[in-house]
């Protein structure tokens, strides 16, 4: 397991403790004085990156327009992404200090703080930025497995683990790709118009002129990532490239020639990507458990450890699988174009009810709004990111929004056990 030294940048305008002391009174994540935060595990999606396509001509076939040019290699965290994650880290550090978990003693020793990222550049760089923001001046080092980009970390792999034929058939029967295709007809039509697909090399040279024409298939293979092929996969790739350019602030001429000219259009085309993620494990909790049980087991290990603060940095595919495996109910994220936002964070929170001593659990999705992403808004307790409470169908909430921690541990254990079947 490699350790990456903490990187401090000129972007840090003060420590987490200073921010926590002088911030205005704002407690977006504190249930009441009767509860105290015992520990938290933060699972973060990596921050704002460049598109993952390595061939610069890969996107050219979809549109006659010029695509955005990037100053970092494919799939790398951008400079803006580093700033955004540093700001997010500063907010987290202030919140953790405010809740009494990030103390001066814990900062100095580093004991009880664990930070671990998948071994690719965008996750490691994201982790470094969060650590720099949250734990400025602390004895905290980000860890990862193997050499950067050279080895796959099994914890973060979202591949099927020897799925039975019965599981594969059941999962495929639970997904109606034809109905999904019909549902997205207007979205494909708008995207096709925006990128001028009728004048693309795909249409003019190959005769493939219907962007939404291929229903595709639900692909489940041992040792391979679960995926949906066809038009929704192509649409997701195109929308992702446009959205990343939008977030990073590329000129309009490099974003479909300026044709995505309203928030309504952004929401409409991004629904293709959102539906891909909603559908990937929809009604397929068992498959999600099969895919994600190594990560679920690692999360349980960290929650059961002496660590008070754990940070894991992975990918959107990890979050999609985790939410499905744990039976999280459908949700909506206000002020976000994405349902799995870039840089978004799942907070697995263990709280103690002080009068009774009982442990309670909350799962929150904390994320930067679209406006905060684009404007590079500094975050603090006074200007926090958005937060949405998630609901696990197997863990009933009380009137305060908590479920019993013991019951959550049962849900987690059952998910891991089912995944190993």
What spans do the regions from the language model cover?
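Signature for phosphate-centric chemistry
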Residues: 24-114, 118-310, 316-421
